[in-house]
């Protein structure tokens, strides 16, 4: 796997804050089931980091939505989103698309 790729993933920062991050992640389109399957197969068989990156970015809004549901539990939302994003990346690594489930279902 190529680890020298320049990643342009959005990040939560103190400068723009949560609202800027939420605006950034709206730019990433959701994937059709077929495209998600092909990207996941590509990632699994060839280690194509761009395919994995597209899988991750297409699910960032889901992570943010779930984290927002836990506001008021004493944890900062930005930390919950960051941890959720790490979990999403781990789920992409272990995801087996041939089992017939969507990534969002597996990641939960």
Task: Place the predicted regions along the sequence by residue.
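Alpha-helical promoter-recognition and RNA polymerase-docking modules of transcription initiation factors
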Residues: 2-108
């Amino acid at each position: 796997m190529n680890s020298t790729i320049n990643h342009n993933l959005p990040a939560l920062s103190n400068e723009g804050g949560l609202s800027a991050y939420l605006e950034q992640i709206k730019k990433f389109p959701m994937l059709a089931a077929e495209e998600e399957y092909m990207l996941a197969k590509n990632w699994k068989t060839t280690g194509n980091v761009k395919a994995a990156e597209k899988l991750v970015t297409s699910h960032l809004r889901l992570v943010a939505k779930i984290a927002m549901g836990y506001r008021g539990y004493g944890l900062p939302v930005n930390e919950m989103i960051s941890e959720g994003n790490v979990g999403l990346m781990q789920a992409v690594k272990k995801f087996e698309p041939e089992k017939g489930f969507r990534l969002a279902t597996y990641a939960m």
